Amino acid sequence: MNAMGSDYIREVNVVKSARVGYSKMLLGVYAYFIEHKQRNTLIPAGFVAVFNSDESSWHLVEDHRGKTVYDVASGDALFISELGPLPENVTWLSPEGEFQKWNGTAWVKDAEAEKLFRIREAEETKNSLMQVASEHIAPLQDAVDLEIATEEETSLLEAWKKYRVLLNRVDTSTAPDIEWPTNPVRE
């Protein structure tokens, strides 16, 4: 038997009222003394009543569980799974597409971020195409150096070298408005 005169204390799920919502509390012989004094008041939308057993009272706590907010620094979606207020660095508004930044009230296009991305993308493309050109040039150059190249190989070597020079001249800072030279295989 405990101090309250009951050894039948157990945790159960209780619906106090349709207007109060769901809570968990300890019930025993004297559990009827633990009452929600405001059970006839409506709980505002976005809140839930939580019973504090230390204070023997109900408190309203923000409830955004199951909702998605967006980090204003990264635009990443964050799923809310716990009770309590939202972090300060989030918004309900989702970014529309890529290269968005938060201006304090809305998502706006981040032209600078997009430009930097396009330049990096163009540099990667240029490096990849230069590698392909060098791979084609190497065996053709070997054939010429060994004086065993056919006319077709000599012609292809010249075309690939010209392509590589033109490719090297591409200004990636103008991305995405780049006119790439034509690959000799495609001519």
Swiss-Prot record:
InterPro entries: Phage_T4_Gp38_tail_assem (IPR003458), TFA_Chaperone (IPR051220)
Bilayer-spanning residue ranges: none
Any one Pfam family match given in the protein's UniProt record, by short name: Caudo_TAP
Family (UniProt): In the C-terminal section; belongs to the tfa family.
Any further remark recorded for this protein: Encoded by the cryptic lambdoid prophage DLP12.
The name this protein goes by in its record: Protein TfaD
Chain's gene name: tfaD
